[in-house]
Structures are given as structure tokens and as C-alpha cells.
């Protein structure tokens, strides 16, 4: 009977980082930062698949999301929590990769891999540095993943909004010749009133741009 290979985060850590972790007294801070560095070099799959070269990295996306959350004016929102959630919401992709709906993987398996990665990073690499950081990062990631708080919902919307902004930037860069309309489907997933307003303003600017190409 053939054994089933189950994906595990620890099996996907680069050799040079494993070398750090295998030392008698591992430098866990360095190992963690080296893993996060992978987000700076991994390109966002959706743009790669549409021939955008060069395109943004996962880290680029999360950084601008974090800054965007600072623009929230809703007084009921803890913006500092939003910033934290934005910074960690995709950090499992450092080992899992940027999986899209076009990839041959179920949503359940994608979630399992990401959750296992977050647990592994928090328990095995971050906790030896800081127990409080380990708990906070896991809690913030779950707040986004499970949408358990207002801040998680705002960051979910800003995830979509930032992608739409990036889409428009690439449409402008390629003078409207790249067909990126499929990314506009994210508009319907935005729930909060404030981010809806941002999106409507963005769409008006986008329409004006495409109208100008017809002149």
C-alpha cells in the first residue's frame, strides 16, 4: 500500500534556515526573519499568471495593506490591531506559497497548510523568542482567517481593495492593453461601508482612464 505524503511546513523550510535551527543554540530571531524574507522574493501568483513582469511580491502587498488600514476613520475600529492583522494575514505563504483558485488544490487543503504553517512558526520558531508575540500573531491571523472581529473584516476588505488598486496601476502601466478584468470580481466581496466608498472612488478613476484611451 502506497504511503500518502502529507504536506508539512517543516519539510518546506530552505536548507540554510534549517542549518540555523539545527545548531545547539539556534538563533530563532534570525531564522524567523529569514523565513519572512521569503515573502519579499515570492511574486503574487495572479499577476505572474497574467504576464506582469516584474510584479509585486507578497510582502509588497501586505506592507501597503498595513499602511492602508491607517486611513480607516471608523471610530469603532482598533487601527493598531488592523495593522497587525494586515502584517500577518498572508505570512503562511512564506512556506505555503501564493495559492490561487486556479491551482489544483481544495480550499480545505489550502486552509490546512496555512494553519499548520502558522501554528508551526508560532510554536516552534517565534515562541522561543517571545511567548507573547507567538500568541498575538496566532490570534491576529485567526482573527483574519475566521473573521471573528470588526478589524478582521476591515482587513479582509482592504485585502481586496489593495488588489484592485494594484490592478488599476498595472492597467495604467500597460496602457489598458492587459486584460485584468477578472480581478474586478473582488468588488462584490467588499462588505464595509468605508472600503466600499474607497472602491467606488477607485472605479470612477479607472473608468475615466479607460474613457481617455478612446479619445
Curated annotation (Swiss-Prot):
Q: Name one GO molecular function term.
A: GMP 5'-nucleotidase activity
| Residues given in the record as a divalent metal cation 1 binding sites | 61, 89-90, 159
Q: Is Transmembrane helix found in the keyword set?
A: no
Effect the entry attributes to changing residue 114 to A: Abolishes activity
What is annotated about its quaternary structure and interactions? Homodimer.
- The chain positions of domain HD read 58-164
| GO cellular component annotations of the record | cytoplasm; nucleus
- EC number(s)? 3.1.3.89
Summarizing the annotation, the consequence of altering residue 89 to A is: Abolishes activity
State what changing residue 111 to A does.
No effect on activity
Q: What else is known?
A: Present with 1500 molecules/cell in log phase SD medium.
Positions binding a divalent metal cation 2 in this chain are 93, 98-99
Per its UniProt record, what SMART domains does this chain match?
HDc (SM00471)
List the protein's name: 5'-deoxynucleotidase YGK1
According to its UniProt entry, this protein's organism is: Saccharomyces cerevisiae (strain ATCC 204508 / S288c) (Baker's yeast)
Q: Which PROSITE patterns match?
A: HD
The note on the cofactor says: Binds 2 divalent metal cations. Shows activity with Mn(2+), Co(2+) and Mg(2+) but shows no activity with Zn(2+).
Cofactor(s) recorded for this entry are: Mn(2+); Co(2+); Mg(2+)
State what this protein does.
Answer: Catalyzes the dephosphorylation of the nucleoside 5'-monophosphates deoxyadenosine monophosphate (dAMP), deoxycytidine monophosphate (dCMP), deoxyguanosine monophosphate (dGMP) and deoxythymidine monophosphate (dTMP).
Name the protein family.
Belongs to the HDDC2 family.
Keywords assigned by UniProt? Cobalt, Hydrolase, Magnesium, Manganese, Metal-binding
Its catalytic activity?
a 2'-deoxyribonucleoside 5'-phosphate + H2O = a 2'-deoxyribonucleoside + phosphate
- Per its UniProt record, what InterPro entries does this chain match? HD/PDEase_dom (IPR003607), HD_domain (IPR006674), YfbR/HDDC2 (IPR039356)
Q: Which GO terms describe its biological process?
A: deoxyribonucleoside monophosphate catabolic process
Amino acid at each position: 500500500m502506497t504511503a500518502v505524503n502529507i504536506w508539512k511546513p517543516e519539510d518546506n523550510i530552505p536548507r540554510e534556515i534549517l542549518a540555523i535551527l539545527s545548531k545547539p543554540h539556534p538563533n530563532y530571531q534570525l531564522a524567523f526573519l529569514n523565513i519572512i524574507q521569503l515573502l519579499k522574493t515570492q511574486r503574487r501568483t495572479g499577476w505572474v499568471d497574467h504576464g506582469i513582469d516584474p510584479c509585486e511580491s507578497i510582502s509588497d502587498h501586505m506592507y501597503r495593506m498595513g499602511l492602508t488600514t491607517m486611513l480607516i476613520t471608523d471610530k469603532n475600529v482598533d487601527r493598531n490591531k488592523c495593522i497587525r492583522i494586515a502584517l500577518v494575514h498572508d505570512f503562511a505563504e512564506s512556506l505555503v506559497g501564493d495559492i490561487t483558485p486556479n491551482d489544483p488544490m481544495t480550499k480545505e487543503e489550502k486552509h490546512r497548510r496555512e494553519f499548520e504553517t502558522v501554528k508551526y512558526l508560532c510554536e516552534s520558531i517565534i515562541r522561543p523568542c517571545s511567548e507573547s508575540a507567538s500568541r498575538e500573531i496566532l490570534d491576529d491571523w485567526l482573527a483574519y482567517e475566521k473573521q471573528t472581529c470588526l478589524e478582521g473584516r476591515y482587513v479582509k476588505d482592504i485585502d481586496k481593495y489593495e488588489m484592485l488598486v494594484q490592478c488599476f496601476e498595472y492597467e495604467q502601466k500597460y496602457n489598458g492593453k492587459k486584460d485584468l478584468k477578472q480581478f474586478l470580481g473582488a468588488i462584490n466581496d467588499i462588505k464595509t461601508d468605508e472600503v466600499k466608498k474607497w472602491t467606488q472612488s477607485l472605479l470612477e478613476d479607472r473608468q475615466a482612464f479607460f474613457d481617455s484611451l478612446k479619445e
